[in-house]
């Protein structure tokens, strides 16, 4: 009946690939665009924007080059009338057949580092000191916890 349907509120999910009409098999995205998409969809939700920054840092330091546009998803919650960044998934050490990140970091797909990570964060409106601190925290954590697997 109607009351049961009202109690069963569904969440919709869309990937960055679907939202931006991208072929996830082709490198066609930069984290600048992912940060902008996250800010727009989540109405500049600080938690989600910072989370996207952390994912970018993790993908760089953990050598997850399979960071294509279908691996970034947003969930719409009808009850709150709001899009949110989904929990992270498909986070694993990986190369691509062309040897670069599928999503570039400030234009660098081959060997992005702290400079590019911070540039993306700052352009997204975060303080440089925050970006540097978070990038270093994630680098140290990945090195400490995943060192054996990243050799």
What is each PLM-predicted segment?
Residues 1-9:
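Single conserved hydrophobic/aromatic residue that forms the stacking wall/gate
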Residues 29-97:
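Conserved kinase catalytic-core segment
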Residues 109-151:
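Mobile late-domain/C-terminal helix-loop "cap" segments
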């Amino acid at each position: 009946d109607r009351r049961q349907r009202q109690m069963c509120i569904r969440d919709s999910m869309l990937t960055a690939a679907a939202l931006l009409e991208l072929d996830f098999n082709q490198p066609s995205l930069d984290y600048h665009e992912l940060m902008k998409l996250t800010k727009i969809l989540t109405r500049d939700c600080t938690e989600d924007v910072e989370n996207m920054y952390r994912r970018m840092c993790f993908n760089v330091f953990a050598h997850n080059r399979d960071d294509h546009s279908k691996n970034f998803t947003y969930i719409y919650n009808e009850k709150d009338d709001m899009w949110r960044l989904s929990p992270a998934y498909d986070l694993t050490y990986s190369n691509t057949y062309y040897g670069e990140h599928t999503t570039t970091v400030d234009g660098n797909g081959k060997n992005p580092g702290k400079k590019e990570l911070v540039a993306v964060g700052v352009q997204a409106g975060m303080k440089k000191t925050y970006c540097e601190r978070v990038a270093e925290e994630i680098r140290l954590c990945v090195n400490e916890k995943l060192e054996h697997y990243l050799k």
